[in-house]
């Protein structure tokens, strides 16, 4: 009887212990869910806000075309659009003629020759399309910091009438920095090298990418649309989860470009399966960001001391 009683007590104790443990696990799970709930809600809110901003940026990008550029960069003069002079950012060709040792009357014929040479570098369908347009005006236009020290121009073309504009941008292409360490590119024309590289790497390139030499033939240029519905993301406004997703998309795009232009098997073998390359890129990025800040600090000091001339508020 005592033995039977002991067995019953042990069984009850074990059942009670299991019930207690089950209750504790249930409470712990509920507590974890309560903690996870706000995080999930916050993540969902961030995702919704990111989607809203993306749709807004996409809609804004769709307005960035030649018609928008026309309203900002040109004015109607005697029934014909002319690029507005906004020195030092925009200087029309009529004010640049003397710079190139030309008379104002010589500018348009020279532009036509350049336009003809550029069209010859395009596929037949694009060339045929551009034959519907004629040059109306041109100007030198200062662009981003990445192009400081190089020449950049814009050309206004007109299709069926004055309200059918097309703006093309002409940017100087210099020698690749890799030529100091690697064999020279098989493209002797730097503009062609840039264009062929973009066509190779990008899933969808600008349909009007082409190239020419300058008037003095010593400078190389590539042509593209000034505005073709391009947009940009405001990284500084992104939440951490959105920034992570954006970085992954950029990484995927960059990897795809490398795979299109190189040997994907060799690159995959080089990268391997560990995170050594990831850590190297992270360390390099951090050092590069620090270097940028230091360079900018020296740049500002040079301006303030008068060693470097600069025009502010442009």
Regions found by a protein language model. Give the residues of each.
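Conserved ATP-binding subdomain of kinase catalytic cores across diverse folds
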Residues: 1-68, 113-314
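Catalytic core of tubulin tyrosine ligase-like
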Residues: 73-75, 80-126
